[in-house]
Amino acid sequence: MPIVKVRENEPFDVALRRFKRSCEKAGVLSEVRRREFFEKPTWERKRKKAAAKKRHLKKLARENARRVKLY
């Protein structure tokens, strides 16, 4: 859990913004959404495999786009 110490003479809004930013960096909200419901191990493996496949295809598309000559 991210901790933000409020500095002297610091407005509450600024401290809240820093806290939200640190939560976003730490991935707290995405972790909460992921753990909201129980995910069977088979579903988890399936989701991770699909994500890996998507990353791989994206990487291949980037490499192929670099090789295409525009002239």
From Swiss-Prot:
<keyword id="KW-0689">Ribosomal protein</keyword>
<dbReference type="GO" id="GO:0005840">
    <property type="term" value="C:ribosome"/>
</dbReference>
<protein>
    <recommendedName>
        <fullName>Small ribosomal subunit protein bS21</fullName>
    </recommendedName>
</protein>
<dbReference type="GO" id="GO:0003735">
    <property type="term" value="F:structural constituent of ribosome"/>
</dbReference>
<comment type="similarity">
    <text>Belongs to the bacterial ribosomal protein bS21 family.</text>
</comment>
<dbReference type="InterPro" id="IPR018278">
    <property type="entry name" value="Ribosomal_bS21_CS"/>
</dbReference>
<dbReference type="Pfam" id="PF01165">
    <property type="entry name" value="Ribosomal_S21"/>
</dbReference>
<dbReference type="InterPro" id="IPR038380">
    <property type="entry name" value="Ribosomal_bS21_sf"/>
</dbReference>
<dbReference type="InterPro" id="IPR001911">
    <property type="entry name" value="Ribosomal_bS21"/>
</dbReference>
<dbReference type="GO" id="GO:1990904">
    <property type="term" value="C:ribonucleoprotein complex"/>
</dbReference>
<keyword id="KW-0687">Ribonucleoprotein</keyword>
<dbReference type="GO" id="GO:0006412">
    <property type="term" value="P:translation"/>
</dbReference>
